[in-house]
Every structure is written in C-alpha cells, then in structure tokens.
C-alpha cells in the first residue's frame, strides 16, 4: 500500500520492564478502537431496512423493487470484503478502518438529506452499492488487528466479545427511528407513521457514523511490533500448531495469500459455502422483519423498531455464550458449536413463521405490542433468533482467521464473507423479496428455512472435517 495506508514499520523493542504494562494498556486501547469502530459501521449497515416500510407506505417503491435495490448491498459488500481484505492485510488498520466508516456514513447522509439520492431505482441501487463497498473496509482491519494482538487460546472469547459490536451498533438505527418518531410527535402532535420518518432513519445514523470515525483513528494502532512489542505468540508463549515465524510474522505476497492459504484450503471452502446459508437467515430475518411485521402481524412503527432493536440486542449474550462454549466446552471445535446453534436457529425461524397474526377483530383490544399475546410471541421469537444466529456468524469468521497465517487472516475471512454476502445477503434481499411478492410470505419463509437446513448439513461436514484436521495436526488447543 501507499501513503497513510502503508503498514506501520516495526521498531526497536521496548525495555523488558515496560513490555507487560504497555502490552496490556495497548490491548485495551486497540480493542476499544475495533469495538466502537465496527459498532459504528453498523449504524449504517442495515438502517436502510428500517426505511423500507416508509418507502412502501408512501407508494414510492414495491417490495420487489426494494429487494432489487437491497441486493446491491450484499453484492458490493461481498466483493469489497474480499478485495479490501487483501488490501487490509497489507495496510495500516489505524487509517483503513475509520476511512471506510467516514465514507459509508457520508453515503447514508446523502440518501437521507438529498431527494436526488432516492429519486429512482438506479440511483438508489448505486448509492446502496457504494455504501456496501465502503462497508467492506470494516471487518478485515478488525480481524487483522485481533490476530496480531490476541493469541489462539484466547481468541474465541475475544472475538465473541468483539463480535457483539455489530449488535450494539445495529441497535442504534432502531433507537434513532424511535427518536425521530418522538420528535415528529412533539412537532406535529400525532403519532408518526413509517412514511413520516424514513429519511431520518438514513441520515441520523449516517451523521453519527462520520462523527465516530474521528476518535477511532486516534485510539487504533497497527501491529505490536510497530509499538516496540514482541509478537503476541512470543509474549503469551502460545503458539498455533502450524506456527512458522516466517509466514506468521513476515508479510506475504498477494499470490501466497490468495493461492496458497485461501484457494488451496479445503476446510475454508466448506465454511465459506456454509456461510451463504447462515447469512441468508441472518439477513432474511433482519432485512424483511420490519415489512413482514407491519404487513402481516399488524405491528406499528414503534413495535417494529423495538423488534428490530431487540433482535440485535439478543445477539450480544448469544454470541458471548457461543464463543465461550466453543472455547471452554468444545475446546476450539468451531464446526460442532456452529452445527448445534444452527439447528436451534432453524427451529426458531419455523416457530416465528407458524405463529399466527392477531385476528383483525381483536386488534382494538390491545394498545401496544407487549399487551398483545400474538405480537408478544413474535417479539420473543425474534429475540430467540437474534440470540442464536449471530453465534454461527461469529464462529465462521473466527474459524477463517484460524485457518490461515496472521498475514493472510483478513483475506481468509474476506473469502468467507464473499460467499456470505454474494450468496446469502443477495438472496436474503432479492430472492426473499421476489418470493414474498409472488408467493406471499410463506414463499419467503420456505427460502429461509431451506437455507437453514442446508446450513446445518454443511456445518455437519465442517464438524467432521475439523475433527480430521485436528487429529492430523495433534490437538494442543490451549495447552501452550
């Protein structure tokens, strides 16, 4: 890379008496940077989904049209995450991470404040594509940072904690819609409908994301060696089974990264394909629940915003539990943990689909969703799905990081993301939108449930192959 994006050079090691204290302080500091930085990316990752009911209600776009527009996000993000991962592996995350955040926030701010940016399908598709491309600059530098600052035996826990950042950030758009609704009520004296606040759901999070980019730059650092510290493996005396100082600590060529450590890695291919169907459910529920709950389950804008928010909130304890289980109970067996969580996730999606809508004759009996037993059940099931689905999402990214040397970790994770977003997110938007438009919401749920079953089968294969892989290397997880 060049200019400010160039990796920070290694410097002379600090005196021995300063290493421990400096390492501990900088790990907290760097973690704050990647946690709050990545959380801010999620201010503007899926906030467009909350604008969709308003765009439909205002008669501006149909579900099928929004599905086409929304597909740009997955297409762009999948390509970008892979391309940017290769660039990130040879860049300074201190610059790379906040720069992408700034550009992504700018895209959403333009869409919310300037009518030309939402004036037609083509221009909206381009704007969503650009936002998705800049979003691809978020995960790779964070993954690169974690493999340099935390060793293998602690990585499952630290990645699961960090992974909750996107759930924390994902709650912000819903909260901002509630804020916009409150402002509308205070100025107009009537309850806001979806068509009244869709612009705010775009530019409120966009402005917030741009503001967050500034402190992220100041707290981030590149590698430990660029701060005068030894490698994390040396400091913790915790080496992977296949550790080789040349490949782990020295920069690799683009060909070595892509061909040797990605394309020839069979286990990485398995988890990449599984990621397609994990992401299909993750984004199928997230993207279409605001419309589904509004059209079918009779939720108002406040109920929809609360359900969207709790879906992300529930992911925090679910992801932490999944990371802890994979580390402490299953001793690093990511495939087994993901297999169990995806079985439970698919069952929860079936229950969400089967729960009946409130009979229209009874709607007047309930003043809020939490007083309505039908809607309360939907709310609980949304919570359960959010609790379960983000564990496999986290595990696949973590597994990819562990299947390649540190200098190729971002590309390995980008490879799985490429499949997840090109296959899973595009399908969650375009295919589910098309199915719901032409076959009703049952058609949309057939797609999601079928994806859940395929994810379970693929993670079963991963589980079996993972066992063979560990047996071949000698399972010394967490013993060094």
From Swiss-Prot:
Its main location: membrane. The chain crosses the membrane at residues 37-57, 65-85, 95-113, 122-142, 162-181, 202-219, 275-295, 301-321, 335-354, 360-396, 416-437, 443-463. It holds the Pfam family MFS_1. It is a multi-pass membrane protein. Residues 1-36, 86-94, 143-161, 220-274, 322-334, 397-415, 464-479 are cytoplasmic. It is found in: Cell inner membrane. One of its GO terms (biological process) is glycerol metabolic process. InterPro entries: G3P_transporter, MFS, MFS_dom, MFS_trans_sf, OPA_Antiporter, Sugar-P_transporter_CS, Sugar_P_transporter. GO terms for cellular component: plasma membrane. The keyword Cell inner membrane applies. Residues 58-64, 114-121, 182-201, 296-300, 355-359, 438-442 are periplasmic. Disulfide bonds: none annotated. Keywords: Cell inner membrane, Cell membrane, Glycerol metabolism, Membrane, Transmembrane, Transmembrane helix, Transport. It comes from the Bacteria. GO terms for molecular function: glucose 6-phosphate:phosphate antiporter activity; glycerol-3-phosphate transmembrane transporter activity. Belongs to the major facilitator superfamily. Organophosphate:Pi antiporter (OPA) (TC 2.A.1.4) family. Responsible for glycerol-3-phosphate uptake. This is Glycerol-3-phosphate transporter. It comes from Haemophilus influenzae (strain ATCC 51907 / DSM 11121 / KW20 / Rd).
């Amino acid at each position: 890379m060049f200019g400010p994006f160039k990796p920070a050079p290694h410097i002379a090691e600090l005196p021995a008496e300063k290493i421990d204290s400096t390492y501990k302080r900088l790990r907290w500091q760097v973690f704050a940077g990647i946690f709050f930085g990545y959380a801010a990316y999620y201010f503007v990752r899926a906030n467009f989904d909350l604008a969709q009911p308003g765009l439909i209600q205002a008669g501006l776009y149909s579900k099928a049209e929004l599905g086409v527009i929304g597909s740009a996000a997955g297409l762009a993000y999948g390509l970008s995450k892979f391309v940017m991962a290769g660039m990130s592996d040879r860049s300074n995350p201190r610059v790379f991470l906040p720069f992408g955040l700034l550009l992504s926030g700018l895209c959403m701010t333009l869409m919310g404040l300037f009518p030309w940016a939402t004036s037609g399908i083509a221009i909206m598709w381009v704007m969503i594509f650009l936002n998705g491309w800049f979003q691809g600059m978020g995960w790779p530098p964070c993954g690169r940072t974690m493999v340099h600052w935390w060793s293998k035996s602690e990585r499952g826990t630290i990645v699961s904690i960090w992974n909750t950042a996107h759930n924390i950030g994902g709650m912000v758009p819903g909260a901002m819609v509630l804020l916009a609704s409150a402002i509308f009520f205070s100025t107009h004296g009537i309850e806001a409908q979806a068509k009244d606040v869709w612009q705010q759901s775009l530019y409120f999070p966009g402005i917030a994301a741009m503001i967050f980019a500034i402190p992220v730059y100041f707290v981030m650092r590149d590698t430990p060696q660029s701060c005068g510290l030894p490698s994390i493996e040396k400091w913790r005396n915790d080496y992977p089974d296949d550790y080789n100082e040349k490949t782990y600590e020295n920069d690799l060529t683009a060909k070595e990264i892509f061909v040797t450590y990605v394309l020839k890695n069979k286990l990485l291919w398995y988890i990449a394909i599984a990621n397609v169907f994990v992401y299909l459910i993750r984004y199928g529920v997230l993207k279409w629940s605001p419309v589904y709950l509004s059209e079918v389950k009779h939720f108002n804008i406040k109920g929809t915003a609360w359900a969207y928010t709790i879906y992300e909130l529930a992911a925090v304890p679910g992801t932490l539990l999944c990371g802890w289980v994979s580390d402490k109970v299953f001793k690093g067996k990511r495939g087994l943990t993901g297999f169990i969580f995806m079985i439970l996730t698919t069952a929860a999606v079936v229950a969400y689909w089967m729960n009946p809508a409130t009979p229209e004759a009874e709607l007047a009996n309930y003043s809020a969703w939490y007083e309505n037993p039908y809607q309360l059940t939907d709310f609980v099931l949304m919570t359960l799905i959010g609790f379960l689905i983000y564990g496999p999402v986290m595990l696949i990214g973590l597994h990819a990081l562990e299947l390649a040397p540190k200098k190729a970790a971002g590309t390995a994770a980008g490879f799985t993301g490429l499949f997840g977003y090109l296959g899973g997110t595009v399908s969650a938007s375009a295919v589910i939108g098309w199915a719901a438009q032409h076959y009703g919401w049952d058609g949309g749920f057939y797609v999601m449930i079928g994806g859940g079953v395929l994810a379970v089968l693929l993670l079963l294969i991963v589980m079996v192959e993972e066992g063979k892989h560990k047996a071949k290397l000698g399972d010394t997880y967490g013993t060094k």
